Amino acid sequence: MAVRPIRIVGDPVLHTATEPVPVGADGSLPADLADLITDMYDTMDAAHGVGLAANQIGVSKRVFVYDCADERKKTTRRRGVVINPVLETSEIPETMPDPEDDDEGCLSVPGESFPTGRADWARVTGLDADGTPITLEGTDLFARMLQHETGHLDGFLYLDRLIGRNARSAKKTVKSHGWGVPGLSWMPGEDPDPFGH
């Protein structure tokens, strides 16, 4: 299908909760959803991401794709799509995030990363591309991805979770790049890779 531009922090679609994907009485999904999911995979792959929410490409639908290892620096990955996800987590630590273990980035904040507090365990329930109910759960990096992508669909970026000096640093970084305004995007595969993959 197609690689689509990824919206950058400040675009209203990233800061607004997405709409659930309608499911028919027979469990059927909208006919155009398959093309959207294919475009999301293509875009995530071109950007070398571990996840991508639909609103990151400007579509306000409650769906995300992922291609993520369970732990950092592991090569075995899980790949799939979750439609209308519902998130459940363990308690989020109230301590300052560790600069190494809790570092998090985002394709909508290209090239930047900040320590972000997240729960150690997460579970998401939803539907797969065929409309079949699924449950995903994990710890470490996979749990972080589940929380990150579901947060996107709720209208939040990981920057919204930052505290203390990390929040101040992120605000300065966004301002220095000229982000935080509507209409900015980058094109995976055409623009330079902001994360250096």
Curated annotation (Swiss-Prot):
Its cofactor is Fe(2+). Fe cation binds at C106, H148, H152. The lineage of its organism: Bacteria, Bacillati, Actinomycetota, Actinomycetes, Mycobacteriales. Belongs to the polypeptide deformylase family. Binds 1 Fe(2+) ion. It comes from Mycolicibacterium vanbaalenii (strain DSM 7251 / JCM 13017 / BCRC 16820 / KCTC 9966 / NRRL B-24157 / PYR-1) (Mycobacterium vanbaalenii). One of its GO terms (biological process) is translation. The keyword Transcription regulation does not apply. It holds the Pfam family Pep_deformylase. InterPro entries: Peptide_deformylase (IPR023635), Peptide_deformylase_sf (IPR036821). Its EC number is 3.5.1.88. It catalyses: N-terminal N-formyl-L-methionyl-[peptide] + H2O = N-terminal L-methionyl-[peptide] + formate. GO terms for molecular function: metal ion binding; peptide deformylase activity. Keywords: Hydrolase, Iron, Metal-binding, Protein biosynthesis. HAMAP family: Pep_deformylase. This is Peptide deformylase. The active site is at E149. Removes the formyl group from the N-terminal Met of newly synthesized proteins. Requires at least a dipeptide for an efficient rate of reaction. N-terminal L-methionine is a prerequisite for activity but the enzyme has broad specificity at other positions. NCBIfam families: pept_deformyl (TIGR00079), PRK00150.1-3 (NF001159), PRK12846.1-4 (NF009483). The keyword Glycoprotein does not apply.
